[in-house]
C-alpha cells in the first residue's frame, strides 16, 4: 500500500511523520485519521478550539498515550514501538509551568541537570547558560515562588533544554499569560527555532500561530481540515475588504477589493456613490477569518468542551 502521508516541506527529512492517526476514549473519537509531516527545524502550529484534539495529538506524539490506529514517528522512531528512543529526543512544555516554587531558578535547572546525568560542575554551568538564554540571569538566585507568570513559563522552557531536544512540543504555552508576557515568550520560541530546534506548537490564539509558525494545520472535530502557510490559508478565503464604520465604531458597510490601488479607488467610489459617510479602513484576512470559514466558529469563542486527553498531559507533568 503506498504511503499517503504528505511529504515534509523542502528543507530536509521529517522530524514528525503521522499517518492515519486515530485515538478514542470509550466511544468518543478524538483523533480521526490524522495525516501530516513536519520538517526538521520547522515551527509547525496546530490550531483548534478546546476539545478539537490538540492535546490528544501531543499526548500520542510524546508517548504519553498509545494510538488506537495509524502510525506516528518522531525523530525517526515509532512512538508505539520505540517510546524510549522518542523520549530521549524530545521535550514537552504544557499549559502550566512544572517548576519547584521553593527552589531558586538556578537550583531548578541544576537539579534537573544532575537528574539527567550531568556532573555537578557541568550542571551548574549549563544552568547559567540557560538563565542567560532565557533572559532570567538577574532572577536566577531568587525563589521561583516570587516569579511572574511569564518568568515561570520561561524557566519551564529552559528546563526543557537542560539536555537539548531534537523536537520541542509546546501545548498552548502562553495560556493565561498577559500580552507582554506572551510576546516575551514568543521571542524566546523564535530564538529556539532560529537555532534549529523543531517546534510543534498547539494553540487557540490565532495571532500566536501567525507570528510563530512556518506552517499551520487547522484541527476540528478530530480531523485536519486545512494545512499550509498562514498566507496560503488566508488567500483561500478571498482578498481585502474596505470597511466603513460610523462615529460609534459600528460597521456600516464593507466592500471587497483586490488590494490594488485601482481596486481601492473603486471601493471608495462605491462608498461615495452610495452617499455613505464615516471612517474608512482596510481589513486583510486573518487566521481568525480562516478559522471561521473552515469550522464555523472562532477559535476563542467555541464552547470549551474539554479534550479528554488534557488530564493525561497534566498528570504526566
Regions found by a protein language model. Give the residues of each.
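Catalytic Walker B motif of ABC-type/P-loop ATPase nucleotide-binding domains
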Residues: 168-171
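Short, charged/small-residue-rich alpha-helical element at the C-terminal edge
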Residues: 232-317
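ABC ATPase "signature
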Residues: 227-228
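Conserved ABC ATPase "signature" region
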Residues: 110, 114, 121-139
Amino acid at each position: 500500500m503506498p504511503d499517503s502521508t504528505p511529504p515534509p516541506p523542502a528543507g530536509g527529512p521529517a522530524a514528525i511523520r503521522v499517518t492515519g492517526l486515530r485515538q478514542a476514549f470509550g466511544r468518543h473519537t478524538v483523533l480521526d485519521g490524522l495525516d501530516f509531516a513536519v520538517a526538521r527545524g520547522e515551527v509547525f502550529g496546530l490550531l483548534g478550539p478546546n476539545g478539537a484534539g490538540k492535546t490528544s495529538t501531543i499526548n500520542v506524539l510524546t508517548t504519553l498515550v498509545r494510538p488506537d490506529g495509524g502510525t506516528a514517528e518522531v525523530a525517526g522512531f515509532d512512538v508505539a514501538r520505540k517510546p524510549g528512543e522518542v523520549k530521549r529526543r524530545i521535550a514537552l512544555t504544557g499549559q502550566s509551568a512544572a517548576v519547584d516554587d521553593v527552589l531558586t531558578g538556578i537550583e531548578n535547572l541544576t537539579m534537573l541537570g544532575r537528574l539527567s546525568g550531568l556532573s555537578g560542575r557541568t550542571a551548574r554551568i549549563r544552568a547559567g547558560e540557560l538563565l542567560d538564554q532565557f533572559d532570567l540571569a538577574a532572577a536566577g538566585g531568587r525563589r521561583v515562588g516570587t516569579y511572574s507568570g511569564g518568568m515561570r513559563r520561561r524557566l519551564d522552557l529552559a528546563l526543557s533544554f537542560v539536555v537539548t531536544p531534537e523536537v520541542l512540543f509546546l501545548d498552548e504555552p502562553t495560556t493565561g499569560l498577559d500580552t507582554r508576557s506572551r510576546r516575551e515568550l514568543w521571542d524566546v520560541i523564535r530564538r529556539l527555532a532560529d537555532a534549529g530546534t523543531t517546534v510543534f506548537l498547539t494553540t487557540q490564539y490565532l495571532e500566536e500561530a501567525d507570528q510563530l509558525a512556518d506552517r499551520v494545520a487547522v484541527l476540528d472535530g478530530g480531523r485536519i481540515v486545512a494545512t499550509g502557510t498562514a498566507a496560503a490559508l488566508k488567500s483561500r478565503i478571498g482578498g481585502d475588504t474596505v470597511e466603513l464604520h460610523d462615529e460609534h465604531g459600528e460597521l456600516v458597510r464593507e466592500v471587497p477589493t483586490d488590494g490594488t490601488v485601482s481596486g481601492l479607488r473603486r471601493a471608495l467610489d462605491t462608498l461615495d456613490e452610495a452617499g455613505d459617510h464615516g471612517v474608512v479602513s482596510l481589513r486583510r484576512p486573518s487566521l481568525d477569518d480562516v478559522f471561521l470559514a473552515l469550522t464555523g466558529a472562532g477559535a476563542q469563542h467555541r464552547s470549551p468542551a474539554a479534550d479528554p486527553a488534557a488530564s493525561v498531559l497534566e498528570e504526566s507533568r
